[in-house]
Amino acid sequence: TGVLFCLLMAGSPYGLAEKPVLTDWNYLPSYGQSLSVGWTAKPVVTTEQKNGNLMFKGGVRPFEGGNDRSAVIPLVEGVSPDGARGETPVSGAAGNFMRLLKKRASGKASNVRFLCSADGVGGVSIGVLSKGNAPYQRILDDLTAGRELASKAGKSFSMPCFLWTQGETDQQDRKTGEWYKEKMRALIQDIDADAKAVTGQKNDVLCFGYQVASHLNYFARNP
């Protein structure tokens, strides 16, 4: 059982995804550039966790909390130490997933939790976020730590999907649609393969994305 989403699939990025398999703990990262980590998104609104969702001990942005993945705690949002980042997209997404699951499969919802993390980097190209670079390693570290913590807690663990909020930098750099498509396809396939290798899951990792259709180039003015 699970929830049906219209998403980008690892092997077929423009198709209709099958229902993802949900385990006890489900790793859900918010990935991309600045919006994915809550740039200027203040005040924060998720100050109390009402759906049982989780984050690592270091916070929803673990890189701000010393990358402390030694335990899980209730998912809440906070302002970054430098004051630049606030509410990330992952809390709203996880909360809505849980509310939808409670409507469609209330019996299963009582056992399901999302383990959330915001691992993006502001102002970078999709290339910087691709496999082999430091931001991507955050996802691998989350996966490994999540699997170990879930095992200790006697919980099943998988990665059903990730949130993707990126594209403004590549649009500014005049990258073509075909170039971006291939980069995106490779990223989804890499995350899918690595998640399966860590968790042992059979189901594909799905991707929620958005379209940067009307973005003005940085520092441009709207006449």
Language model features with spans:
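Cell-envelope and extracellular/periplasmic
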Residues: L16-P223
